[in-house]
């Protein structure tokens, strides 16, 4: 959510 890496939360 910070820079568009919401998919990297895992």
From Swiss-Prot:
Q: Which family does it belong to?
A: Belongs to the FARP (FMRFamide related peptide) family.
Subcellular localization is given as: Secreted
A biological process (GO) of this protein is: neuropeptide signaling pathway
Tissue distribution of the protein: Expressed in the CNS and thoracic perisympathetic organs (tPSO) but not in the ring gland, midgut or abdominal perisympathetic organs (aPSO) (at protein level).
- Residues where Phenylalanine amide occurs? 10
**Role description:** FMRFamides and FMRFamide-like peptides are neuropeptides.
Q: How is this protein named in the record?
A: FMRFamide-like neuropeptide SAQGQDFMRF-amide
Q: What are the alphabetically sorted keywords of the record?
A: Amidation, Neuropeptide, Secreted
A Gene Ontology cellular-component term: extracellular region
- Where does it mainly reside? secreted
């Amino acid at each position: 959510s910070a820079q568009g890496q919401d998919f990297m939360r895992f």
